[in-house]
């Protein structure tokens, strides 16, 4: 299927395919699936937050809150996954996070929440990508940022 921008729309991506695309593994694979993809232009990733995640042992034991930096990493993994999917060469490239700008954390993310991560490509130049990212829980914005990443060939 081709959309109006001429980029290929892809099927949703489950955890098995994410494992074949991204190098991240437990406890640092921070997306469970991608439910909507429009080529490399935009996507929606899902992260189900559970009390069993190791960061909750210390952040914070009496009132667990997902660290903001891990929300940013989930955004980066969603953006990286769609960039690598578009290239079509799984595990032959890596995506490195280069910058995070205008990060804002608006509400805490706690166990039981489902984080919905919206990423939208803002700029593409050679191996560089810039994305606008928004994380929501039940339709309420909990975090946002702009990120830049570089795609490099894996050695």
Curated annotation (Swiss-Prot):
EC category: lyase
CDD domains on file: FabZ (cd01288)
Pfam families membership: FabA (PF07977)
Catalytic activity: a (3R)-hydroxyacyl-[ACP] = a (2E)-enoyl-[ACP] + H2O
EC id: 4.2.1.59
GO biological process, one term: fatty acid biosynthetic process
Annotated catalytic residues: 59
GO terms for cellular component: cytoplasm; membrane
UniProt-annotated location(s): Cytoplasm
Main location group: cytoplasm
A single MF term (Gene Ontology): (3R)-hydroxyacyl-[acyl-carrier-protein] dehydratase activity
Keywords from the UniProt entry: Cytoplasm, Lipid A biosynthesis, Lipid biosynthesis, Lipid metabolism, Lyase
NCBIfam families documented for this protein: fabZ, PRK00006.1
HAMAP family: FabZ
Function: Involved in unsaturated fatty acids biosynthesis. Catalyzes the dehydration of short chain beta-hydroxyacyl-ACPs and long chain saturated and unsaturated beta-hydroxyacyl-ACPs.
Assigned protein family: Belongs to the thioester dehydratase family. FabZ subfamily.
Name this protein carries in UniProt: 3-hydroxyacyl-[acyl-carrier-protein] dehydratase FabZ
Protein species of origin: Bartonella quintana (strain Toulouse) (Rochalimaea quintana)
């Amino acid at each position: 299927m081709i959309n109006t921008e001429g980029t290929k729309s892809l099927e949703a991506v489950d955890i098995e395919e994410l494992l074949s695309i991204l190098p991240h593994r437990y406890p640092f694979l921070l997306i469970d699936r991608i439910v909507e993809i429009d080529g490399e232009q935009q996507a929606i990733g899902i992260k189900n937050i559970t009390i069993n995640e190791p960061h909750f042992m210390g952040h914070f034991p009496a009132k667990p809150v997902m660290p903001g930096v891990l929300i940013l990493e989930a955004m980066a993994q969603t953006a990286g996954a769609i960039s690598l999917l578009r290239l079509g060469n799984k595990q032959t490239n890596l995506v490195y996070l280069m910058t995070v700008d205008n990060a804002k954390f608006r509400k805490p993310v706690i166990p039981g929440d489902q984080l919905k991560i919206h990423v939208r490509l803002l700029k593409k130049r050679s191996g560089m990508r810039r994305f606008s990212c928004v994380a929501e829980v039940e339709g309420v914005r909990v975090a946002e940022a702009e990120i830049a990443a570089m795609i490099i060939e894996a050695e």
